[in-house]
Amino acid sequence: MSSKQEKTKARLPRGFVDRTSAQLYAIEVMIAQIRQVYELYGFEALETPIFEYTDVLGKFLPDEDRPNAGVFSLQDDDEQWMSLRYDLTAPLARYFSENFETLPKPYRSYRLGFVFRNEKPGPGRFRQFMQFDADIVGTPTVAADAEICMMAADSLQKLGFQHHDYVIRLNNRKILDAVLEKVGLAGSEQAQRRLTVLRAIDKLDKFGLEGVRLLLGKGRLDESGDFTKGAELKDKEIDGILSLLTIEVGTAEETFDALRKIVDQSEEGLEGVRELEEMQAIFAENDTQNRIKIDPSVVRGLEYYTGPVFEAALLFDVLNDDGQKVVFGSVGGGGRYDGLVARFRGENIPATGFSIGVSRLIAALQNLGKLPVKEKTGPVVVLMMDKEPEIVARYQKMVMQLRSAGIPAELYLGASGMKAQMKYADRRQAPCVVIQGSQERESGTIQIKDLVEGARLSHEIKDNQTWRESRPAQVTVDEEQLVKTVQDILAAQKR
């Protein structure tokens, strides 16, 4: 056995990412902008825990001992299964049901947080990602669905996307349900096959019509050799479903006429078309019809949607991992889910909502060159020229004086000499450093070096001796002038 202690390998779990300060700043700015829109529409904040009892989440429960199909789960000490939330909607349904008597109805809320999927990771596909949701619970009117769509469009507009950059694509699950009923997929006994069909259609943008056809049939083999089992529908059934996806979208009225023909005499399907017509009238009245379009291919891959479904899609091209141009695609979606709260209350509570994929939006803004960038200015660094306790306390007092004036500052707390400390300040992107050695201390002075100006002048003064003699961008002032001098330097750097 080796006497050396075995080192633990530093490694990140697959499907998870670290986020830098710059990335976090961009996320914070983006979230603040979306929050402004949500609150302008009258929504209030809500936070729920990342863990819920597994039966509360519901959707991914398998017929096996450990409920881990699609979710991360653990068993509590009371032997109850808990799971990390896979979205923010199921926890909202639980919260609304628990607090039904005290909440206003309709209840408008927005939630921000990480969700978790125990799925195969891949490029741009993570097991932990952030969502920003807004929902209205307690009203059946499609005016609520229309308002959610308009709010989604306004959120993208607020982030800097232009009208030609995006579209909110809209359909109604009742129309698809009518088509599924025609091909024999109605009833609870067909629930699993129906869910497989929904997920297959939801891959239309990714795999195209032929890929969806394979997933509706026997299954699809991807480029890596992985096989995804299909819904095993017959060719005639597949053709019936694909006829909905291939409707040519013209004017709104032409699209509605085509949808009525597809659903035939199905009352549920015709009701779905009427709801879309009501929403279209609202969009036209509010001049948003050019940003929100009827698209029969939108289904959303979750079983619990019961009415209008919508998806926010970005329309510009980006390069994929193979260097090919592809449309950026979906950055969020949602719909009506009138049955989700019924699991807790035994009665249908109408609800509708929308979820924005924060990570996808960050990538989109980066592609357009619109990602918020923080000014690359770090804290003022006070160098530690002497490590005697009473001297360290004196340095710390300087730091506190700067902080009290609202100036970010830190005391160098490493063990290196002055040269390494200066390199540290550069790496921290400090605007200036404060230096007080024994000579300055005896005279009650400090040296303040403007690193920004110094870097600029270094390109002009090439001779080392001249540089050392002139000591550019460096001033010596009395200790009591510390704050004012630093303030003047920072102000000059901004000019």
Curated annotation (Swiss-Prot):
SUPFAM superfamilies linked to this entry: Class II aaRS ABD-related, Class II aaRS and biotin synthetases
Key words of the record: Aminoacyl-tRNA synthetase, ATP-binding, Cytoplasm, Ligase, Nucleotide-binding, Protein biosynthesis
GO biological process entries: histidyl-tRNA aminoacylation
One Pfam family hit: HGTP_anticodon
Major location category of this protein: cytoplasm
Keyword Plastid: no
GO cellular component, one term: cytoplasm
Subcellular location: Cytoplasm
Family: Belongs to the class-II aminoacyl-tRNA synthetase family.
Subunit structure: Homodimer.
Name of the protein: Histidine--tRNA ligase
